[in-house]
């Protein structure tokens, strides 16, 4: 350090390794453990415990804590390199092999082994716990050939006996193919019927929903029009002291429940306010004017 450098005073600690607190025997924890029967160098807990065989020298030392400075979950392994070896080590091994007198064929074989190990480690790190299982083969179950019923005259039995073996196999194959084709046709027809019935049901449901919506809209529009007409009539006639204002007749409610929304309550409140302002008696009560 030259003369132009800033002057810094550094004081060397009496305990540079920070071991005074761990070696002290005057602390509260050390004293209370001794009072409970613990001695320095012994393990915590009962001596005849079931897990006493798993104790090591680290069990008698101080607890060491690892600082967690990442966002990984508990038990997660830190990300390691896929190869975990210095760059160019393969080429260096090949150079050493040439210097030791190995042939090119041996070097190529060793390099191929190293490449295979690299690929295996890369695949194990990228796709963990993936096991590819070959799928089985789907084989159609063959229907058992039905034995033709015996006729009254015994003609069927004689025909079956006289038919050669090759012809019998051909007939059995034809019967199985015919039965399979009939089964397929029946299954296809059943599926078509089911799809048609489902489509018709869905169409009917949609039609009913549309009709219900139209009925609701028509009823709400009729009720709003009737309320507006009654308000206009009361406004034209004007309030009087002797004659009480006729209240509008409530429209006949249908059995279907109408949704009571915020706008309907707000409209009622505004209508009541207008009626109170138009009535002289209510205005006098509001302004506390005695007549």
Swiss-Prot record:
GO biological process, one term: rRNA processing
Segments forming domain G-patch: 25-79
Keyword terms: Nucleus, Ribosome biogenesis, rRNA processing
Domain of life: Eukaryota
Record-linked PROSITE patterns: G_PATCH
Bias type Basic and acidic residues, positions: 194-205, 230-247
MF (Gene Ontology): nucleic acid binding
Organism: Aspergillus clavatus (strain ATCC 1007 / CBS 513.65 / DSM 816 / NCTC 3887 / NRRL 1 / QM 1276 / 107)
Protein name as annotated: Protein pxr1
Amino acid composition bias (Basic residues), ranges on this chain: 1-11, 206-219
Location relative to the cell: Nucleus, Nucleolus
Free-text function comment from the UniProt entry: Involved in rRNA-processing at A0, A1 and A2 sites and negatively regulates telomerase.
Family classification: Belongs to the PINX1 family.
Main location, first listed in the record: nucleus
InterPro entries according to UniProt: G_patch_dom, PINX1
A GO CC annotation given for this chain: nucleolus
Region Disordered, annotated ranges: 1-26, 146-268
Sequence ranges of Polar residues compositional bias: 15-25, 146-156
């Amino acid at each position: 350090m030259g003369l132009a450098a800033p002057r810094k005073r550094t004081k060397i600690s009496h305990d540079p390794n920070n071991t005074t607190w761990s070696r002290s025997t005057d602390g509260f924890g050390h004293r209370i453990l001794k009072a409970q029967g613990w001695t320095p160098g012994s393990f915590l807990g009962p001596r005849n415990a079931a897990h006493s065989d798993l104790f090591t020298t680290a069990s008698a030392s101080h607890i060491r804590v690892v600082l967690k400075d990442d966002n990984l979950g508990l038990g997660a392994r830190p990300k390691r390199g896929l190869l975990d070896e210095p760059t160019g080590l393969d080429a260096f091994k090949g150079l050493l092999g040439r210097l030791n007198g190995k042939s090119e064929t041996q070097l190529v074989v060793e390099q191929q082994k190293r490449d295979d190990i690299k690929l295996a480690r890369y695949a194990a790190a990228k796709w963990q716990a993936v096991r590819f299982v070959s799928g089985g083969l789907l084989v159609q179950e063959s229907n058992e050939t039905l034995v033709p019923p015996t006729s009254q005259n015994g003609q069927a039995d004689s025909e079956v006996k006289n038919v050669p073996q090759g012809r019998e196999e051909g007939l059995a194959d034809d019967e199985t193919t015919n039965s399979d084709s009939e089964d397929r046709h029946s299954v296809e027809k059943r599926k078509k019927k089911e799809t048609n019935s489902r489509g018709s049901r869905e169409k009917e449901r949609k039609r009913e929903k549309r009709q219900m919506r139209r009925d609701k809209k028509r009823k709400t529009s009729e009720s709003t029009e009737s309320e507006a007409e009654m308000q206009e009539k009361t406004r034209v006639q004007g309030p009087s002291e002797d004659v009480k204002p006729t209240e509008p007749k409530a429209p006949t409610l249908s059995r279907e429940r109408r949704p009571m929304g915020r706008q309907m309550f707000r409209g009622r409140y505004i209508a009541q306010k207008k009626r109170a302002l138009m009535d002289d008696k209510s205005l006098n009560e509001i302004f506390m004017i005695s007549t």
